[in-house]
Amino acid sequence: MENRERLGSRLGFIMLSAGCAIGCGNVWKFPWMCGQNGGGSFMLIYVICLIVLGLPTMIMEFSVGRAAQTSPLYMYRKLSGGRGKWNLWGIVCLIGNIALIAFYAVVSGWILYYFVKFLTGQNQDFGFEKMITTPSVNVTYLLVTLLIAFVILSFHLQGGLERITKYMMSALIVLMLVLAVHSFTLPGAGEGLSFYLIPHFSKITGSVVVGAMNQAFFTLSVGMGGMAIFGSYVGKDRSLMGESIHIIILDTLVAVIAGIIIFPACFTYDVEVTAGPSLLFDTMATVFNNMAGGRWWGTLFFLFMVFAAMSTVLGVCENILAMVRELTGWSRPAGCVACGVGCFLLALTTALGFSVFHFQPFAAGTTWLDFWDFLVSNNIMPIGSILLAVFCCYKVGWGWNKFLEEANAGKGLKVQPWMKPVFKYFVPAAVLFIYVYGMVNFAWK
């Protein structure tokens, strides 16, 4: 395989990393989790988790990736000098990214389907339940989603992924601001924003904390190499703490603005904010269908969602592609064909899981989507974050001094020595406690 590719600019690195973080986790999963967990209460815990858990983990991921100059498949083995069994977690990172795309690409296909329906004026002729139980719709839009992603990735890094992501992220921010301004004009804006932004401390429970932590890791794509791959594409001219803060701020702003767009509309048209995964589909489609000029507002809304979803699909597929190419030595085009076919076949489990390939992994009503989401969000990401902290802070792995040197190389904000207890003790202990609490609660459901 050719020498390692590089991103063309600092802006490209920030936009690409933010694009991977900003996706369905912000515009699909965050609003309905917020609605089901008390609105402002969930928001408060979520922001705390981003700062005290997500930020240190992101800095560690970028550092490991930049130091190793390899994909997550080999970075642990390379930096540990072959000690221990760290190479096994590289394999888990590959499995985790494939499992993520197995349901993420399907959800992205749903968003693309809704965009096409609104754009073509067919927004009255479909529904969420009808869509997910129609095999031809799910399979077709899954195929289109992955085809778009791997065609873009088949070009070299700067001319394909970096350039497209810059355009998509810029368009996404503009669309979100237009939609947010419109939401402020709705009659239910005050009530919706009050529910969304004002915390009610009586609603903060253990389940809310677990959900907020899992959502923080899910949206930042940390714990299984989602950020490390982009760290491997940049030089050492900027320190990684400042870059991580910029990315988290962008990610959080998109999540917050998504709620500002959605909750005023829900309260204006008296729709249920606890609708769950269908909130962004049936609920918002109903809102737009009853709104003056709703077809065009709906088109803009789902176009912004397409950009958000595709930015993450591209990031995850790039990670899978990089690992497979390092494993096989294939060129970008050849790797794209193989990875595209493999991801499509695995994602068929989710696409057909609501109809002809029905599977209930946990309880009545659960599907393949729940299985893949549980595997990635509730297990691989938090466990990966614990192992990453151990790897970066203890001699059994890479070690604190080497991590600190890498994280602080270049201009910008530095990780301070007094922060060591946060990285070494607080992050792994807090994540482990919340993870075990969540597993116990899950087992007793």
Please provide the spans of the model-predicted regions.
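C-terminal membrane-solvent junction of multi-pass transporters and transport-like membrane proteins
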Residues: 88-97, 328-342, 371-431
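Membrane-interface "cap" regions at the ends of multi-pass membrane proteins
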Residues: 1-29, 57-62, 66-88, 235-239, ...
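Helix-loop-helix connectors at the membrane interface of multi-pass transporters/channels
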Residues: 74, 108-133, 234-237, 242, ...
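Loop-to-transmembrane helix boundary motifs in multi-pass membrane proteins
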Residues: 6, 12-14, 20, 136-140, ...
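Inter-helical loop and helix-membrane interface segments of multi-pass membrane transporters/permeases
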Residues: 3-5, 32-37, 67-92, 105-160, ...
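Select transmembrane alpha-helical segments in multipass membrane proteins
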Residues: 6-17, 42-45, 84-98, 142-145, ...
